Amino acid sequence: ALTCSDVSNKISPCLSYLKQGGEVPADCCAGVKGLND
């Protein structure tokens, strides 16, 4: 089961991408993939 802190830690690298666009950071991609584990 995921906790809220797990989710926020894993998606935090995505926030700047979501705000500004551009390339998806590798940390974001890895974090999102990690949510499925």
Curated annotation (Swiss-Prot):
GO molecular function, one term: lipid binding
Protein name: Non-specific lipid-transfer protein
Keyword Transport: yes
UniProt cross-references to Pfam families, sorted A to Z: Tryp_alpha_amyl
GO biological process: lipid transport
Protein family: Belongs to the plant LTP family.
SUPFAM superfamilies: Bifunctional inhibitor/lipid-transfer protein/seed storage 2S albumin
Source domain of life: Eukaryota
Protein's organism: Artemisia vulgaris
Gene3D superfamilies hit by this protein: Plant lipid-transfer and hydrophobic proteins
Biological function: Plant non-specific lipid-transfer proteins transfer phospholipids as well as galactolipids across membranes. May play a role in wax or cutin deposition in the cell walls of expanding epidermal cells and certain secretory tissues.
Keywords from the named record: Allergen, Lipid-binding, Transport
